[in-house]
Protein backbone atom coordinates (compact mmCIF):
# COMPACT_ATOMS: atom_id res chain seq x y z
CA UNK A 1 0.00 0.00 0.00
CA UNK A 2 0.98 3.65 -0.38
CA UNK A 3 1.62 5.44 2.90
CA UNK A 4 3.24 8.64 4.11
CA UNK A 5 6.33 7.73 6.14
CA UNK A 6 7.48 10.00 8.96
CA UNK A 7 10.73 8.92 10.62
CA UNK A 8 12.04 12.18 12.08
CA UNK A 9 10.70 15.48 13.36
CA UNK A 10 10.82 18.53 11.18
CA UNK A 11 9.05 20.54 8.47
CA UNK A 12 6.77 18.92 5.86
CA UNK A 13 9.78 17.99 3.72
CA UNK A 14 10.60 15.16 6.17
CA UNK A 15 7.52 13.29 4.91
CA UNK A 16 8.03 10.56 2.31
CA UNK A 17 5.53 8.61 0.24
CA UNK A 18 6.48 4.92 0.36
CA UNK A 19 5.19 1.46 -0.49
CA UNK A 20 4.57 -0.44 2.75
CA UNK A 21 2.92 -3.68 3.80
CA UNK A 22 -0.78 -3.45 4.54
CA UNK A 23 -1.29 -3.54 8.33
CA UNK A 24 -2.99 -6.45 10.08
CA UNK A 25 -5.59 -5.59 12.72
CA UNK A 26 -5.10 -6.88 16.26
CA UNK A 27 -7.94 -8.58 18.13
CA UNK A 28 -9.26 -5.18 19.23
CA UNK A 29 -8.81 -3.32 15.94
CA UNK A 30 -10.46 -2.91 12.56
CA UNK A 31 -8.68 -2.61 9.20
CA UNK A 32 -9.92 0.39 7.22
CA UNK A 33 -9.50 1.08 3.53
CA UNK A 34 -9.04 4.84 3.71
CA UNK A 35 -10.95 6.97 1.20
CA UNK A 36 -10.43 10.42 2.71
CA UNK A 37 -8.29 12.00 5.39
CA UNK A 38 -7.20 15.55 6.21
CA UNK A 39 -4.21 17.67 7.12
CA UNK A 40 -4.98 19.81 10.15
CA UNK A 41 -3.23 21.90 12.80
CA UNK A 42 -2.80 18.85 15.01
CA UNK A 43 -0.93 17.04 12.23
CA UNK A 44 1.30 20.04 11.52
CA UNK A 45 2.26 20.45 15.18
CA UNK A 46 2.85 16.72 15.54
CA UNK A 47 5.34 16.29 12.69
CA UNK A 48 7.45 19.15 14.08
CA UNK A 49 6.93 18.10 17.73
CA UNK A 50 6.24 21.69 18.70
CA UNK A 51 5.96 22.46 21.53
CA UNK A 52 8.80 20.17 22.57
CA UNK A 53 6.89 18.44 25.37
CA UNK A 54 4.68 16.80 22.70
CA UNK A 55 7.53 14.31 22.41
CA UNK A 56 6.46 12.81 25.73
CA UNK A 57 3.51 11.43 23.77
CA UNK A 58 4.84 11.13 20.22
CA UNK A 59 8.36 9.91 20.99
CA UNK A 60 11.35 11.62 22.58
CA UNK A 61 13.97 11.28 19.83
CA UNK A 62 11.88 10.13 16.90
CA UNK A 63 8.21 9.40 16.17
CA UNK A 64 6.76 6.26 17.77
CA UNK A 65 4.11 6.07 15.07
CA UNK A 66 5.66 6.47 11.65
CA UNK A 67 2.54 7.19 9.60
CA UNK A 68 0.92 10.56 10.41
CA UNK A 69 -2.72 11.55 10.12
CA UNK A 70 -5.48 11.94 12.72
CA UNK A 71 -8.81 12.14 10.83
CA UNK A 72 -10.15 9.46 8.51
CA UNK A 73 -13.08 7.94 6.68
CA UNK A 74 -13.27 4.72 4.75
CA UNK A 75 -14.54 1.16 4.57
CA UNK A 76 -13.87 -1.66 7.02
CA UNK A 77 -12.09 -4.54 5.27
CA UNK A 78 -11.36 -6.78 8.28
CA UNK A 79 -12.16 -6.92 12.00
CA UNK A 80 -10.34 -8.38 15.00
CA UNK A 81 -11.99 -11.20 16.93
CA UNK A 82 -12.98 -8.95 19.84
CA UNK A 83 -14.78 -6.36 17.69
CA UNK A 84 -18.45 -6.01 18.63
CA UNK A 85 -19.90 -2.96 16.91
CA UNK A 86 -18.51 -3.17 13.36
CA UNK A 87 -18.47 -5.64 10.50
CA UNK A 88 -16.67 -5.89 7.17
CA UNK A 89 -18.15 -3.45 4.66
CA UNK A 90 -19.19 -0.78 7.18
CA UNK A 91 -18.44 2.79 6.15
CA UNK A 92 -16.79 4.56 9.07
CA UNK A 93 -15.14 7.81 10.11
CA UNK A 94 -13.21 8.94 13.16
CA UNK A 95 -10.37 10.77 14.83
CA UNK A 96 -7.42 10.04 17.10
CA UNK A 97 -5.49 13.07 18.34
CA UNK A 98 -2.55 10.83 19.28
CA UNK A 99 -2.25 9.55 15.72
CA UNK A 100 -4.47 7.34 13.60
CA UNK A 101 -1.96 6.63 10.83
CA UNK A 102 -4.56 7.77 8.32
CA UNK A 103 -2.20 9.20 5.70
CA UNK A 104 -2.16 5.83 3.99
CA UNK A 105 -4.33 3.62 1.82
CA UNK A 106 -5.01 1.34 4.80
CA UNK A 107 -4.94 1.83 8.57
CA UNK A 108 -5.93 0.00 11.74
CA UNK A 109 -7.65 1.51 14.77
CA UNK A 110 -9.59 0.48 17.87
CA UNK A 111 -13.36 0.63 17.52
CA UNK A 112 -13.80 3.33 20.18
CA UNK A 113 -12.22 5.87 17.80
CA UNK A 114 -14.69 5.29 14.94
CA UNK A 115 -18.40 5.49 14.10
CA UNK A 116 -20.46 4.52 11.07
CA UNK A 117 -20.97 7.31 8.52
CA UNK A 118 -24.55 8.63 8.18
CA UNK A 119 -26.14 7.72 4.84
CA UNK A 120 -26.44 11.38 3.80
CA UNK A 121 -22.74 12.14 4.33
CA UNK A 122 -19.83 11.63 1.90
CA UNK A 123 -16.42 10.26 2.82
CA UNK A 124 -14.92 13.74 2.47
CA UNK A 125 -17.55 15.40 4.64
CA UNK A 126 -17.13 12.73 7.30
CA UNK A 127 -13.34 12.93 7.39
CA UNK A 128 -13.48 16.72 7.73
CA UNK A 129 -16.02 16.74 10.55
CA UNK A 130 -14.07 15.51 13.55
CA UNK A 131 -10.91 17.35 14.67
CA UNK A 132 -12.30 20.88 14.68
CA UNK A 133 -15.61 19.83 16.20
CA UNK A 134 -13.92 17.72 18.90
CA UNK A 135 -11.81 20.64 20.08
CA UNK A 136 -14.60 23.20 19.72
CA UNK A 137 -17.07 21.08 21.69
CA UNK A 138 -14.57 20.41 24.48
CA UNK A 139 -13.75 24.09 24.86
CA UNK A 140 -17.34 25.35 24.66
CA UNK A 141 -18.55 22.79 27.18
CA UNK A 142 -16.17 24.24 29.79
CA UNK A 143 -18.11 27.53 29.81
CA UNK A 144 -21.47 27.95 31.54
CA UNK A 145 -23.29 29.60 28.65
CA UNK A 146 -26.81 30.96 29.04
CA UNK A 147 -29.42 32.03 26.50
CA UNK A 148 -28.85 35.52 25.15
CA UNK A 149 -25.22 35.83 26.21
CA UNK A 150 -22.58 37.26 23.87
CA UNK A 151 -19.76 35.13 22.48
CA UNK A 152 -16.88 36.12 20.20
CA UNK A 153 -15.07 33.57 18.02
CA UNK A 154 -11.73 34.67 16.58
CA UNK A 155 -10.68 32.59 13.57
CA UNK A 156 -14.25 31.65 12.75
CA UNK A 157 -13.45 30.02 9.41
CA UNK A 158 -10.78 27.52 10.42
CA UNK A 159 -11.65 23.91 11.20
CA UNK A 160 -12.13 24.64 14.91
CA UNK A 161 -13.71 28.07 14.46
CA UNK A 162 -16.24 27.02 11.82
CA UNK A 163 -17.27 24.11 14.03
CA UNK A 164 -17.54 26.39 17.07
CA UNK A 165 -19.83 28.87 15.31
CA UNK A 166 -22.16 26.03 14.32
CA UNK A 167 -22.16 24.38 17.75
CA UNK A 168 -22.79 27.68 19.54
CA UNK A 169 -26.13 28.02 17.73
CA UNK A 170 -27.54 25.33 20.01
CA UNK A 171 -26.80 27.40 23.12
CA UNK A 172 -29.00 30.23 21.78
CA UNK A 173 -26.26 32.83 22.27
CA UNK A 174 -25.28 35.82 20.15
CA UNK A 175 -22.16 34.93 18.16
CA UNK A 176 -19.75 37.52 16.82
CA UNK A 177 -17.37 35.95 14.29
CA UNK A 178 -13.97 37.38 13.35
CA UNK A 179 -12.90 36.58 9.79
CA UNK A 180 -11.60 38.06 6.53
CA UNK A 181 -13.79 39.92 4.05
CA UNK A 182 -14.08 36.96 1.67
CA UNK A 183 -15.62 34.76 4.38
CA UNK A 184 -18.28 37.09 5.80
CA UNK A 185 -21.20 35.38 4.06
CA UNK A 186 -19.86 31.95 5.04
CA UNK A 187 -19.79 32.69 8.78
CA UNK A 188 -23.24 34.24 8.61
CA UNK A 189 -24.50 31.03 7.00
CA UNK A 190 -22.83 29.02 9.77
CA UNK A 191 -24.77 30.96 12.40
CA UNK A 192 -22.92 34.16 13.30
CA UNK A 193 -25.20 37.07 14.16
CA UNK A 194 -22.45 39.68 13.81
CA UNK A 195 -19.15 39.73 11.90
CA UNK A 196 -15.90 41.63 12.45
CA UNK A 197 -13.63 41.87 9.40
CA UNK A 198 -10.10 41.61 10.78
CA UNK A 199 -8.66 43.10 7.58
CA UNK A 200 -10.45 46.35 8.41
CA UNK A 201 -10.48 46.54 12.20
CA UNK A 202 -8.81 45.12 15.28
CA UNK A 203 -11.39 43.00 17.07
CA UNK A 204 -9.67 43.56 20.43
CA UNK A 205 -10.63 47.24 20.20
CA UNK A 206 -14.32 46.39 19.82
CA UNK A 207 -16.61 48.20 22.29
CA UNK A 208 -18.90 45.18 22.75
CA UNK A 209 -18.44 43.12 25.91
CA UNK A 210 -18.60 39.33 25.83
CA UNK A 211 -19.30 36.52 28.26
CA UNK A 212 -16.96 34.22 26.34
CA UNK A 213 -14.09 34.92 23.93
CA UNK A 214 -12.89 31.86 22.03
CA UNK A 215 -9.64 32.29 20.09
CA UNK A 216 -9.90 29.37 17.68
CA UNK A 217 -6.61 30.20 15.94
CA UNK A 218 -4.48 31.14 18.94
CA UNK A 219 -3.34 34.43 17.43
CA UNK A 220 -4.43 36.67 20.29
CA UNK A 221 -4.04 36.37 24.07
CA UNK A 222 -5.94 36.67 27.34
CA UNK A 223 -4.18 39.94 28.16
CA UNK A 224 -5.15 41.46 24.80
CA UNK A 225 -8.75 40.26 25.09
CA UNK A 226 -9.37 40.90 28.77
CA UNK A 227 -11.03 44.25 28.11
CA UNK A 228 -13.53 42.51 25.82
CA UNK A 229 -14.78 40.34 28.66
CA UNK A 230 -17.70 41.16 30.89
CA UNK A 231 -17.20 40.65 34.65
CA UNK A 232 -17.07 36.89 35.13
CA UNK A 233 -16.18 36.39 31.46
CA UNK A 234 -13.97 33.59 30.19
CA UNK A 235 -11.22 33.53 27.54
CA UNK A 236 -10.18 30.23 25.94
CA UNK A 237 -7.55 29.73 23.25
CA UNK A 238 -7.07 26.65 21.09
CA UNK A 239 -3.33 27.30 21.12
CA UNK A 240 -0.70 27.20 23.86
CA UNK A 241 0.26 30.79 23.09
CA UNK A 242 3.59 32.59 23.43
CA UNK A 243 5.83 30.67 25.85
CA UNK A 244 2.86 28.40 26.66
CA UNK A 245 1.14 31.27 28.48
CA UNK A 246 -2.29 29.74 27.93
CA UNK A 247 -1.30 26.86 30.20
CA UNK A 248 0.27 28.98 32.94
CA UNK A 249 -2.19 31.89 33.06
CA UNK A 250 -5.15 29.64 33.95
CA UNK A 251 -3.15 28.54 37.00
CA UNK A 252 -2.77 32.17 38.07
CA UNK A 253 -6.17 33.69 37.30
CA UNK A 254 -8.07 31.87 40.08
CA UNK A 255 -5.72 33.61 42.52
CA UNK A 256 -5.81 37.10 40.99
CA UNK A 257 -9.22 37.09 39.26
CA UNK A 258 -10.67 39.50 41.86
CA UNK A 259 -8.19 42.07 40.55
CA UNK A 260 -9.30 41.30 36.98
CA UNK A 261 -13.01 41.89 37.49
CA UNK A 262 -13.55 38.17 38.06
CA UNK A 263 -12.42 37.52 34.49
CA UNK A 264 -10.43 34.38 33.81
CA UNK A 265 -8.81 32.17 31.22
CA UNK A 266 -8.98 28.38 31.17
CA UNK A 267 -7.17 25.82 29.03
CA UNK A 268 -9.24 22.62 28.84
CA UNK A 269 -7.55 19.41 27.78
CA UNK A 270 -9.77 17.86 25.09
CA UNK A 271 -11.07 14.45 26.13
CA UNK A 272 -13.81 11.92 25.32
CA UNK A 273 -13.37 11.65 21.55
CA UNK A 274 -16.24 9.15 21.27
CA UNK A 275 -18.63 11.63 22.91
CA UNK A 276 -17.64 14.31 20.39
CA UNK A 277 -18.03 11.90 17.48
CA UNK A 278 -21.51 10.86 18.61
CA UNK A 279 -22.61 14.49 18.88
CA UNK A 280 -21.30 15.39 15.42
CA UNK A 281 -22.78 12.26 13.84
CA UNK A 282 -26.17 13.10 15.32
CA UNK A 283 -26.03 16.70 14.08
CA UNK A 284 -24.89 15.63 10.59
CA UNK A 285 -27.73 13.12 10.34
CA UNK A 286 -30.16 15.95 11.09
CA UNK A 287 -28.50 18.29 8.59
CA UNK A 288 -27.48 20.62 11.43
CA UNK A 289 -23.70 20.45 11.02
CA UNK A 290 -21.70 20.91 7.83
CA UNK A 291 -18.00 20.35 7.26
CA UNK A 292 -16.35 23.35 5.66
CA UNK A 293 -13.90 22.17 2.99
CA UNK A 294 -11.15 24.45 1.69
CA UNK A 295 -9.52 22.26 -0.95
CA UNK A 296 -8.28 18.83 -1.89
CA UNK A 297 -4.89 17.19 -2.31
CA UNK A 298 -3.78 13.61 -2.97
CA UNK A 299 -1.29 11.47 -1.03
CA UNK A 300 1.26 12.33 -3.72
CA UNK A 301 0.79 16.00 -2.77
CA UNK A 302 1.07 15.49 0.98
CA UNK A 303 4.02 17.86 1.43
CA UNK A 304 2.21 20.63 -0.44
CA UNK A 305 -0.88 20.02 1.70
CA UNK A 306 1.08 20.40 4.95
CA UNK A 307 2.79 23.55 3.71
CA UNK A 308 -0.56 25.02 2.73
CA UNK A 309 -2.08 24.34 6.15
CA UNK A 310 0.99 25.75 7.91
CA UNK A 311 0.42 29.11 6.22
CA UNK A 312 -2.56 29.51 8.54
CA UNK A 313 -5.07 30.84 6.02
CA UNK A 314 -7.19 27.80 5.20
CA UNK A 315 -10.96 28.04 5.27
CA UNK A 316 -12.27 25.04 7.14
CA UNK A 317 -10.58 21.75 6.33
CA UNK A 318 -8.01 20.48 3.83
CA UNK A 319 -8.92 17.08 2.40
CA UNK A 320 -6.54 14.35 1.26
CA UNK A 321 -8.32 12.09 -1.21
CA UNK A 322 -6.87 8.58 -1.05
CA UNK A 323 -6.96 6.84 -4.40
CA UNK A 324 -6.97 3.07 -4.95
CA UNK A 325 -6.32 1.04 -8.07
CA UNK A 326 -7.54 -2.50 -8.78
CA UNK A 327 -4.59 -3.94 -6.85
CA UNK A 328 -5.35 -2.01 -3.66
Predicted features by range, described:
Residues 11, 20-73:
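N-terminal glycine-rich beta->alpha transition that marks the start or flank
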Residues 204-212:
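A short acidic, Gly/Pro-enriched loop at the edge of an enzyme's catalytic core
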Amino acid sequence: MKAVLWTKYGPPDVLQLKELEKPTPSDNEVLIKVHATTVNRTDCATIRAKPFFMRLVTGLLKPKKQIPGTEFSGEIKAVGKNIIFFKTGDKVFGFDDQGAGSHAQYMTITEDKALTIPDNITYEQAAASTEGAHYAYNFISKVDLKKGQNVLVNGATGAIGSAAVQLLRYYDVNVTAVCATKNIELVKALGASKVIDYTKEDFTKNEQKYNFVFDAVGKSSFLKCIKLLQPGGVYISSDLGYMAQNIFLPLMTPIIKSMLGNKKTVFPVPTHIKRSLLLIKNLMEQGKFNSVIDGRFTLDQIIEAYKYVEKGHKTGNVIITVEHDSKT
